[in-house]
């Protein structure tokens, strides 16, 4: 028990970290203003945030903070609504972004202290997004079941604050965090509205990603810890315990007596391993276990969220899929494992033999229904998938309109070109091409036939050109703190996500800051 307690507290901060005074340092807001840290997530409007958050704005904000504290002390006013950022959107955003930089400092210091004296891995394996398919083929082809988990959002801000207390012991910072969550983002209801999450993540993307990943990290930390404790035969360090000795004796007895008749039962003890992958707001847990054990893992997830994090989660958020029958939605693909029969004719002298082999093939298909729903939302087609014009782009030049459609089509084509069945992809490209033509026809008040005759075949060649920039998936070989703790191989990768089609001219791929970990037995 003491060993488990030390294990769980190994990464926590036991000393007091006074982060609140850093809010009065000008360089904090300069770091928050650095777009090298927020380039992929912040959307700039009306001239951008650069012109507003100058060094002068930072100095004014610090002066107002000192004045606000002086007035609060002199008037003995504890009303939090009088905070300086409450009535000023600019200063509110600056404070929240600066606070996001501050709360990341303890975790950065922890990572630096861990890496001191250790040699950093210099080689990084840069692969395209299609490297995920051989990864699944090599690791998932022999598995049976997959848990498709939809990670719930923390719906009570106090849960986040209490979890954060294990890492940072600064009371002022905790009060400020509580204030941001309650006042600005309206997370003080039992059921979090979707609009609150949307405005939260849009106005303060860095702060949102930090809190979300911090919350998910906590539940994953407990998950990996309990998972390793359940893998009895793989924990050699726990063999000194008396109950574990009896456990090994029972297993040896089972191996000796029931070795021939109960191989499946023995596999529950000897082959208890799994693969865990997290991306965006979902997680996948794949294993070769029986349906009984997969149901136990499903109940574990639900109970962990409800009893430890006080987050209400319905069992329907965790689906058990059989890879032979069902498909899993992963990274924009519908992936499944099929048994393809293969008949081979073999002839030896005068005798001929027909050998029937069942080969396992990992198939990936484009989810056509969600793609059409996205195109419908972006006004490229109707709910039936029929292309329509894009009237909001009518004020742009012809070259600009064509360029927008071409960029979207190229990115979608590149991202989904790894599919084994491309019929759905061809339909999506057809919708975009026809929507582009109808948008130009509507702008020039012409007909489709006349317009295509004037443009010629060169118009469609632009949609068939290779994509200029290749989207990449980075697998890092650097070691992290918990890699030495867990009795398994853990790999990390940055999973890319596709931004909304409406709000961006270019269908860019942005780092979602959600780590995907694939854990297997060492």
Swiss-Prot record:
Protein name: Maturase K
Keywords (A to Z) from UniProt: Chloroplast, mRNA processing, Plastid, RNA-binding, tRNA processing
Species classification: Eukaryota, Viridiplantae, Streptophyta, Embryophyta, Tracheophyta
Role of this protein: Usually encoded in the trnK tRNA gene intron. Probably assists in splicing its own and other chloroplast group II introns.
Keyword Isomerase belongs to the record: no
Gene Ontology terms describing biological process: mRNA processing; RNA splicing; tRNA processing
Subcellular location: Plastid, Chloroplast
Gene Ontology terms, MF aspect: RNA binding
Recorded name of the encoding gene: matK
Organism: Sapindus saponaria (Soapberry)
């Amino acid at each position: 028990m003491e060993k488990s307690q030390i294990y769980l507290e190994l990464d926590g901060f036991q000393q007091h970290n006074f982060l609140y005074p850093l809010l009065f340092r000008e360089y904090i807001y300069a770091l928050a203003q650095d777009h090298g840290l927020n380039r992929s997530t912040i959307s700039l409007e009306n001239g951008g945030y650069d012109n507003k958050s100058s060094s002068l704005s930072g100095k004014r904000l610090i002066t107002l903070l000192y004045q606000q504290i002086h007035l609060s002390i002199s008037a003995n006013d504890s009303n939090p609504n009088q905070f300086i950022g409450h009535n000023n959107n600019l200063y509110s955003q600056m404070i929240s972004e600066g606070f996001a930089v501050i709360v990341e400092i303890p975790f950065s210091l922890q990572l630096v202290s861990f890496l001191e004296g250790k040699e950093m891995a210099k080689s990084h394996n840069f692969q395209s997004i299609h490297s995920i398919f051989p990864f699944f083929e090599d690791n998932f082809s022999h598995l049976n079941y997959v848990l498709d988990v939809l990670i719930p959002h923390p719906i009570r801000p106090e849960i986040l604050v209490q979890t954060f207390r294990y890492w940072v012991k600064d009371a002022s910072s905790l009060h400020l965090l509580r204030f941001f969550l309650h006042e600005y983002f309206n997370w003080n209801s039992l059921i979090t509205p979707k609009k609150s999450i949307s405005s939260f993540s849009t106005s303060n993307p860095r702060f949102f990603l930090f809190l979300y990943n911090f919350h998910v990290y906590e539940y994953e930390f407990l998950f990996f810890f309990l998972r390793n404790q359940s893998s009895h035969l793989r924990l050699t360090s726990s063999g000194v315990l008396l109950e574990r000795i009896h456990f090994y004796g029972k297993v040896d007895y089972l191996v000796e007596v029931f070795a021939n008749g109960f191989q499946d039962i023995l596999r529950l003890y000897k082959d208890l391993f799994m693969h865990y992958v997290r991306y965006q707001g979902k997680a996948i847990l794949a294993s070769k276990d029986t349906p009984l054990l997969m149901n136990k893992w499903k109940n574990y997830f639900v109970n962990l969220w409800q009893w430890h994090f006080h987050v209400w989660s319905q069992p329907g958020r965790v689906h058990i899929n059989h890879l032979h029958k069902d498909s899993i939605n992963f990274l924009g693909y519908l992936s499944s494992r099929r048994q393809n029969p293969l008949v081979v004719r073999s002839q030896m002298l005068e005798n001929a033999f027909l050998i029937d082999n069942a080969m396992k093939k990992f198939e990936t298909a484009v989810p056509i229904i969600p793609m059409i729903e996205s195109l419908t939302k972006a006004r490229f087609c109707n709910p039936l998938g029929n292309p329509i014009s894009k009237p909001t782009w009518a004020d742009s030049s012809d070259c600009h309109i064509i360029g927008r459609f071409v960029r979207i089509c190229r990115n979608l084509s590149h991202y989904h070109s790894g599919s084994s069945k491309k019929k759905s992809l061809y339909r999506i490209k057809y919708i975009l091409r026809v929507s582009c033509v109808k948008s130009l026809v509507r702008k020039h008040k012409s007909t489709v036939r006349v317009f295509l005759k004037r443009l010629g075949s060169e118009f469609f060649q632009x949609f068939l050109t290779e994509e200029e920039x290749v989207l990449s998936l980075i697998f890092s070989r650097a070691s992290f703190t918990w890699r030495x703790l867990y009795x398994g191989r853990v790999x990390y990768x940055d999973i890319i996500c596709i931004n909304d089609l409406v709000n961006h001219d270019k269908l860019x791929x942005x780092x979602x800051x959600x780590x995907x970990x694939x854990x297997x037995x060492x």
